[in-house]
Amino acid sequence: MTQFDKQYNSIIKEIIKNGISDEEFDVRTKWESDGTPAHTLSIITKQMRFDNSEVPILTTKKVAWKTAIKELLWIWQLKSNDVTELNKMGVHIWDQWKQEDGSIGHAYGFQLAKKNRNLNGEKVDQVDYLLHQLKNNPSSRRHITMLWNPDELDSMALTPCVYETQWYVKQGKLHLEVRARSNDMALGNPFNVFQYNVLQRMIAQVTGYELGEYIFNIGDCHVYTRHIDNLKIQMEREQFEAPKLWINPEVKDFYDFTIDDFKLINYKHGDRLSFEVAV
């Protein structure tokens, strides 16, 4: 059993047992297959915490880990909102939200690309500012990135689920706290928890720090009603030891990472489970 499997199953059980239904409301989300309202059971403010002795990835089902990393590179390295660039990587998870111009509007990578931070008289974006400050001002309590821009929320195809990171350097270790306003536990959470841990490992490597703790905070923690049956099946499955994540140690520049610089070794997992998408 992995740390992630244990915490994940605990939260799923709590949601199914004690979650509050939103069926009394006219919800925004609709089922992609038939357009009917996609209702949820939810609880609020849950935290997952990892000591980084293992990579947090589920073993009770197959997680498309390469797809998760490609999405991460699209947002954090390319700082892109162009879905066609993601399609070129063979990833289509954002196709449902693609606008007429091929983008997701002013969401995710668009916010990271904005050069709105001052650094030695030059305007830089959030990622470059973070990398510089972690290396040159490690004791700062201001190592934060933010995707939630109130002035541009109406220009986003989808407002960001994971919206904030805060980084801490303590005794030579790089700790990461991630905040998600909302997490779909069947589909979004397994991706987000894994990919932001990969980001922590990438940035620790290029800034020269050891890995510290990884904390993932969720505001609205929910399960869609059509996902419950398969989640119950998933929780009963055999659990395996965590795999090892290899990241090419030769990469010293954040922008030099490619998908070929990552390998997930000895990833044993249950079969893939199908969960319908709510849009």
From Swiss-Prot:
HAMAP family: Thymidy_synth_bact. Catalyzes the reductive methylation of 2'-deoxyuridine-5'-monophosphate (dUMP) to 2'-deoxythymidine-5'-monophosphate (dTMP) while utilizing 5,10-methylenetetrahydrofolate (mTHF) as the methyl donor and reductant in the reaction, yielding dihydrofolate (DHF) as a by-product. This enzymatic reaction provides an intracellular de novo source of dTMP, an essential precursor for DNA biosynthesis. One of its GO terms (molecular function) is thymidylate synthase activity. It catalyses: dUMP + (6R)-5,10-methylene-5,6,7,8-tetrahydrofolate = 7,8-dihydrofolate + dTMP. DUMP binds at residues 141-142, 181-184, 192, 222-224. The keyword Transferase applies. Its EC number is 2.1.1.45. Pathway: Pyrimidine metabolism; dTTP biosynthesis. This is Thymidylate synthase. Transmembrane segments: none annotated. Its main location: cytoplasm. Keywords: Cytoplasm, Methyltransferase, Nucleotide biosynthesis, Transferase. Pfam families: Thymidylat_synt. The active site is at 161 (nucleophile). It comes from the Bacteria. CDD domains: TS_Pyrimidine_HMase. It is found in: Cytoplasm. (6R)-5,10-methylene-5,6,7,8-tetrahydrofolate binds at residues 184, 278. The keyword Chaperone does not apply. Belongs to the thymidylate synthase family. Bacterial-type ThyA subfamily. NCBIfam families: PRK01827.1-1 (NF002495), thym_sym (TIGR03284). InterPro entries: Thymidate_synth/dCMP_Mease, Thymidate_synth/dCMP_Mease_dom, Thymidate_synth/dCMP_Mease_sf, Thymidylate_synthase, Thymidylate_synthase_AS. Homodimer. GO terms for cellular component: cytosol. One of its GO terms (biological process) is methylation.
